[in-house]
């Protein structure tokens, strides 16, 4: 199980993980690592939250919010943001399904993708600033949001089909069992409720799961399934929705 954790940490983040820690693990086994997603989100969000706390007293809330969101993007290598941009470029092209998938494969950033990145990043910065001004514990909020975003992404894997013939997302999409889905969501709920006591964390998690489930159904109808890009989009939007639900 520890090998799966290190493999998942290396897969969806840019944190330095020695290859020997996940040595002997086949790529086809990665689907079992989905249950680690909330814990990886907890780590990434915790680092981002610490950066916010350290910078808040020095440069103020707005700049601290800017740098903590920037740090989160750097910690993931922009992996999920790239998926968000590609998904928006494809979906909002209003083309046929096959053409949408082709556009999503294009490495060039389109207008819709650029606008999506600006909107999501700017909204995250504003929401983090507002939450901090309201006295929300930002270390807990950011850690819980990142855990919720990655945990809720399982809703685009379970009982969904892969929209392409090959790709990184094929490791997870359609390969996750009902038990793994329940465990992943359960762990995300536990993280959210422990970090944000009372109903606040639980309510935000419920809102996030509902929104990501609806997103998954809309993408399924439009693209005929999911891709690695749509998983990245779900993670980014899940984080944002969770933070918005805390307001």
UniProtKB/Swiss-Prot annotation:
Q: Which InterPro entries match?
A: CobS (IPR003805)
Reaction catalyzed: alpha-ribazole + adenosylcob(III)inamide-GDP = adenosylcob(III)alamin + GMP + H(+); alpha-ribazole 5'-phosphate + adenosylcob(III)inamide-GDP = adenosylcob(III)alamin 5'-phosphate + GMP + H(+)
Q: What is its EC number?
A: 2.7.8.26
What keywords does the record list, in alphabetical order? Cell inner membrane, Cell membrane, Cobalamin biosynthesis, Magnesium, Membrane, Transferase, Transmembrane, Transmembrane helix
Where in or outside the cell is it found?
Cell inner membrane
Q: GO molecular-function annotation terms?
A: adenosylcobinamide-GDP ribazoletransferase activity; cobalamin 5'-phosphate synthase activity
Membrane topology, record value: Multi-pass membrane protein
What protein family does this chain belong to?
Belongs to the CobS family.
Alphabetical list of PANTHER family matching this protein? ADENOSYLCOBINAMIDE-GDP RIBAZOLETRANSFERASE
Q: What is this protein called?
A: Adenosylcobinamide-GDP ribazoletransferase
Source species? Salmonella paratyphi C (strain RKS4594)
